[in-house]
């Protein structure tokens, strides 16, 4: 997936109120950008970090700039949680994600489950139905990419919904997109959200599949490249 052009380099001043970030541009101007990430962004929100911003041409937008990338531990990390669904869909359609081939259609944001969630991607075709929930991963400690970076009741709900879909005879997949170049495997962040880790292990034990792929992240493009192991 090509990123919007041009992107604007800057230095992070601070991230606050979850969805706001002050950034100093190359000319010294400080702008307030939209932060499209509701997590804690642990490890990706350090003041002084190099960042890239996109800029909207829509004059009606309150904030023209959107924070897209940050340099974290020597690697570009994609912090925009609105992108992973598109990345996964593109990677399914171009054959990169071999585990999710053979389906004739892909539909986004389909309502499902007893808790009335919206699934990120519903795959339908000859193999049946496959419900795919996508998660963005930017927290890396040592060689392990960890999810979530904050307590996520919504993420817990999604695991329960996927278990229910599997119980009904469909396929359920939790798909982790590691939007940075380090981290050799994905694991639940038990120290941050132990209940999520417990539910993930329970879900996998009950037939939910856990997939993880690394994304190549540059200021020009982001795309999925290789599968990573999920270690529970």
From Swiss-Prot:
GO molecular function, one term: DNA binding
Matching InterPro entries: cNMP-bd_CS (IPR018488), SfsA (IPR005224), SfsA_C (IPR040452), SfsA_N (IPR041465)
Pfam families: SfsA (PF03749), SfsA_N (PF17746)
Coiled coil: none
HAMAP family for this protein: SfsA
NCBIfam families: sfsA
Listed name of the protein: Sugar fermentation stimulation protein homolog
Organism from which the protein derives: Geobacter metallireducens (strain ATCC 53774 / DSM 7210 / GS-15)
Gene: sfsA
